[in-house]
Structure formats: C-alpha cells, structure tokens
Curated annotation (Swiss-Prot):
Belongs to the cation diffusion facilitator (CDF) transporter (TC 2.A.4) family. SLC30A subfamily. Involved in zinc efflux across the cytoplasmic membrane, thus reducing zinc accumulation in the cytoplasm and rendering bacteria more resistant to zinc. It may contribute to zinc homeostasis at low concentrations of zinc. InterPro entries: Cation_efflux, Cation_efflux_CTD_sf, Cation_efflux_TMD_sf, CDF/SLC30A, Zn_transptr_ZitB. This is Zinc transporter ZitB. The keyword Nucleus does not apply. GO terms for cellular component: plasma membrane. The keyword Ribonucleoprotein does not apply. SUPFAM superfamilies: Cation efflux protein cytoplasmic domain-like, Cation efflux protein transmembrane domain-like.
Amino acid sequence: MAHNHSHTESGNSKRLLAAFIITATFMVAEVIGGLLSGSLALLADAGHMLTDAAALFVALVAVRFAQRKPNARHTFGYLRLTTLAAFVNALTLILITAFIFWEAIQRFYDPQPVAGVPMLLVAIAGLLANIVAFWLLHHGSEEKNINVRAAALHVLGDLLGSVGAIAAAIIILYTNWTPIDPILSILVSCLVLRSAWALLKESIHELLEGTPSQLSVEALQKDVTLNIPEVRNIHHVHLWQVGEKPMMTLHAQVVPPHDHDALLRRIQEYLLKHYQIEHATIQMEYQRCDDDHCSFHQENHHLAIHDGEKHDAEGHHHKH
C-alpha cells in the first residue's frame, strides 16, 4: 500500500509539474500579447492563468512536502505551508482583479484601439494550452488528491476565459466594437474573484484552526455516544486540519471497561471509519464531568437514551 501511495503521488507530481510549466509559459505569452495588442481581455485572461499557475504550484508543493516526514522541530510536518501560500495567493489575486476592474472602467470612458488579429492568435494559443493542461490533470488511472482536482477546476475556469477572449477578438475583427473587450475582461475577472474569495476564506479558516467544513463536532459527539454503549459523553473536543488531514483531541467519559485498550481502539476505529480521522488523541474519564462545557452534552445524551428506552418499551407493549 505504501508503494502504491508513493506511485500515486509521483504520478500526481509529474502531471502537476507539466501543467504548471505549460500554464506559466502561456501566461507570459498572454501578458506580452495583451500589451502589444492593447487587449484588456487578454490581460484579464492572463490574470486568470496566473491563478491557475499559482494553484498548480501550491498543489505541486503540497504533493512534494506531503512526502516529507515530520521531525522534532516540525511535528506536524510542512503541510501548513500550502495553506499559507494559498492565503497569500488569494490576496494577490484580489488585488489583480481590482486592477483589471479599474482598467476596464477607464476603457469605457477612454476607449483604446485593439489589434484583433494578434489578440485572436494569442487567445487561441492560450486555449490550446489550457486544453492540454486540463487533459494532463485528468489523464491516468491513479487516484488524484483534492489538490489535483482543485487545480483542474482552476484550469477549466481559465479555459472558459480563453473562449471569452477569442469571442471578443472575433467581434472586434468583424464589427470593430471595442467595448466588448473590457466587458469580457470584467466577466473573466469575476470568475477569478469568485475563486480567490473562496480560497481566501478557506485558507483563513484553516490557518485559524477551524473545524474542517465536511465535519460536524455536534454530529460526531452524538454518533460516538449512541454507537459505542460504553461511551457516556464526549466533551472538550478540538477538531482542526493540517493539509488534508483532520486532527482531533477529545475527552471521553466512559463506563469503566474490562479492557481499556480495546475500548480505546474501538473509538479510534470508529472515528477513522466514519470520519476519516487517522490521528485522534483521546483522554478516557471514568467519572462524571462537572465542567459547564460538558453538561449540555451529558443532558442531551441522557435524553437520547431515555427516548430510545421509551421507544423500545412502546414497541414491546405493542407486541403484547
């Protein structure tokens, strides 16, 4: 299994590197083409390609650093670097988008000539580059991690931006209606802004060690207490995420077991199977928790047990 995981990460790394080189190269080409042709739509699409290149780079770094083992100085490893990079990336993208919006508004008041043919040629080349990058990220039978899938979505969004730039170039060539250029540049920038804002919120949430969006502390507490009879209460839960891995610490108030280690393993296996939590630090308690933090959960647990017993009693009564 370890060998297969290494092979998968190697395949992901090669695909990401190839897609990054293609995207970064054509991003530079689009910037040059946009400046020479005077097309703001090309510059906006280049800004979107910058988001793709940054996303691909972050994904590539994540794959590379994920293979490094934690050490005494960095006990969680280096996965938090990818979150920090995503935060900086999102802030940069928002600034770029604001600049494109400002330039587009200025173009409405002071229209600039746009060279349609160079704009069209560069936009077509950018579209082809995005198609190749998108194919690379989807090619192969290996399991692709969330970073690779997210990067593929970025490239798909940029592919649509290239289509917009081509449409603007064709309209300018046949009608000479240059306002279409800033209009489409604003539409492409909106795609970038949406991605950047979502990335900014997600990275801030993770940097502040917020609960992973796919997990619910309340649901987890209820599930564990209802499905493992020896567990009376779960409290003082701390749930956060490092890279793609959820981490957890909790206190479990339990009925004194015959085998402490066996019960501990059952709780850990339940968390792994139902919540994909591989690393959980569990403090077992054999007495009632008097902390205000846990009284609410204890009352809810007793109510759930009472309701369950009442339901069983009613079912038994109906059988008679």
